[in-house]
Design a protein with these regions (language model features):
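Walker A/P-loop
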Residues: 196-217
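Conserved RecA-like P-loop NTPase helicase motor core
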Residues: 440-536
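Conserved helix-turn-beta segment of the N-terminal RecA-like "Helicase ATP-binding" lobe
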Residues: 231-258
Length: 557
């Protein structure tokens, strides 16, 4: 027995003692391959899953490094069966390979003949495989490349896709590094992606994922299709590309609800591509409009389910996924792995914070006590109405105002999910002399950009954001975020929202992230679920009582 911070159990759970002096080093060592499940104050629970281990394997970690991390930090002897299982699971990745044979086109090759025989017999692969070419090789129908990888993953034999890519139409793109240069982790991320050909780069919000995309485009130097969550995010990409690369206005097209331009670099929204009319998707021609050399998926964890179907047909194109988290609330992480590609690079948030590239943040949960009248109404509410009732309680209003006052001149974002609640907050703050305009889905793109520009210029002190606030909005000076309601217990949303205040501040200021929840309700339970992802990245939540916030004097402004 050693005095390590980790307890490794035979059911593949790992318990990490948070207060141990080596806890941070241990968390960083296990983060590439273990998934955080629960994160109460003193003991965090991680789990080893096949997908987590395969992602680690594809990102360059071998079984030896995983086993070494477990042995190095474990307090008690690690069950031998678990170590064997880790090695065998990781060894499954790449025992089957997809290759491009000069004579036969796409083929599935088995480095282990028995595995090839086993999967070839599976009924799930019916119609995907062609003739057996030799003892180790089976022909694959070219159109089934994506679907085959999905099925092989489900069978427990994830194939390594080495079949290569079409070069696409060449188009010169170069970075214009005048007065700035790629940070070391951005350059590393691009190198890992280029070596793998396709896959996902995981970086914190605010760490410059767009620049990783731009550098990958420069490396590939071919026509590029960039898929984004909404028009505002698309225009942000456009601004960055014009500022940081040799691309000109005429070379970048926008394919959104408002415009339908196809240019050498085209930025399209997920929404437009997944629009259905009479059961068909009329805008899918974008994928065939040019001979794309690279497809970039921004915020890949939010990729709508129909996009996976389209992506299955794009396996001959280089694909780069960018995200702050591989967590998907719909459990489709396996489809991201099979169809976009495995994780190629992952930088822990705290690492990048320690290098000064994102602002240090403290996270606080403020618990509000509902008045008796509301508690009775909550108790009597239907189960499906309970969260909305608790999340939108009026008791939160004075707390929001007090939090804004607590931070004097700092710029504040108030973020929520229910429009009615956000309008109530806006009216309340207005009456209290704190004007805070609302940006929501119905706000026109023009008005949205006007408000964001005013906020960036310091003319607005507070902004209220609906779900729009979760995606790719560049408001670097926001130092305080107050979250009042969300999508039930969504961890990915929590990560996005913290990312809004993590842009490094010019004077090295701390960022503050508050979640206001109703005590003794489902609101508190959901908050605990949402915090898991950030706990995994090393952020601790402090829990305070609303009365403490309401009774403290406001900061000097």
């Amino acid at each position: 027995m050693t005095n390590g911070p980790l307890i490794v159990q035979s059911d593949k759970t790992l318990l990490l003692e948070v207060d141990h002096p080596d806890a941070t080093a241990c968390r960083m060592a296990i983060a590439p391959f273990a998934e955080l499940e629960r994160s109460p104050e003193h003991m965090h629970t991680y789990r080893l899953t096949p997908l987590g281990l395969w992602n680690a394997r594809a990102a360059g970690h071998d079984a030896e490094s995983v086993v070494d991390a477990l042995l190095r930090f474990s307090r008690y002897p690690v069950p031998h069966s678990l170590l064997v299982d880790v090695a065998e699971t990781m060894d499954r990745y790449g025992r089957l390979q997809l290759l491009n044979d000069p004579a036969h086109g796409l083929v599935l090759r088995g480095l282990d003949r028995a595995v090839l025989v086993e999967v070839a017999k599976s009924k799930k692969l019916a119609g995907m495989l062609g003739a057996q070419l030799d003892a180790d090789t089976i022909a694959v129908h070219g159109s089934e490349r994506g679907h085959l990888k999905q099925v092989l993953l489900k069978l427990g034999w994830p194939a390594e896709d080495l079949a290569g890519y079409v070069d696409g139409e060449a188009h010169p793109i170069a970075l214009r590094e005048d007065g700035w240069h790629l940070r070391s982790y951005q350059r590393e991320a691009v190198e890992h992606f280029t070596a793998g050909g396709s896959g996902v780069v995981v970086l914190p919000c605010g760490a410059g994922k767009t620049l990783v995309g731009a550098a990958a485009m420069a490396d590939v130097s071919a026509t590029t299709l960039i898929l984004v969550t909404n028009t505002v995010a698309g225009r942000q990409w456009r601004r960055e590309l014009l500022a940081r690369t040799t691309l000109t206005e005429d070379e970048i097209g926008e394919y959104s609800g408002e415009r339908k331009e196809i240019r050498p670099v085209t930025i399209a929204t997920y929404q437009v591509l997944t629009t259905r009319r009479n059961g068909t998707f009329p805008h899918l021609n974008v994928f065939d409009a040019r001979d794309w050399g690279l497809i970039v998926y921004d915020e890949v964890h939010l990729l709508p389910a129909p996009m996976f179907r389209f992506t299955a047909d794009l396996q001959a194109r280089r694909r780069l996924g960018l995200t702050a988290t591989l967590v998907r609330e719909d459990g489709k992480e396996g489809d991201v792995f099979s169809l976009i590609g495995p994780k190629r690079y992952d930088a822990p948030w705290k690492d990048i914070e320690s290098q000064g590239w994102i602002a240090p943040a403290d996270c606080t949960e403020v618990r509000v006590t509902l008045p008796d009248r509301d508690r009775l109404a909550y108790a009597a509410a239907e189960p499906e109405e309970k969260y909305k009732f608790a999340a939108t309680a009026d008791a939160k209003l004075p707390v929001i105002k007090a939090l804004i006052e607590r931070h004097g001149d700092e710029q504040v974002l108030v973020i929520g999910a229910y429009l009615e609640q956000l309008h109530d907050i806006g009216r309340f703050l207005d009456e209290e002399g704190v004007p805070a305009p609302i940006v929501h889905g119905g706000t026109t793109t023009k008005e949205r950009e006007r408000l964001f520009d005013a906020f960036r210029a310091g003319e607005l002190r507070a902004l209220i954001l609906s779900k729009v606030g979760n995606f790719s909005i560049d408001l670097p000076e926001a130092a305080v975020a107050v979250q009042v309601s969300g999508t039930f217990g969504s961890r990915q949303e929590e990560a996005q929202r913290l990312g809004r205040v993590l842009r490094p501040k010019g004077d090295g200021r701390q960022a503050h992230f508050y979640t206001v929840v109703s005590r003794d309700t489902i609101d508190t339970e959901y908050a605990a679920h949402r915090q898991r992802f950030l706990a995994e990245q090393g952020y601790a939540y402090t829990i305070v009582d609303a009365d403490d916030v309401l009774t403290e004097p406001p900061a000097a402004g």
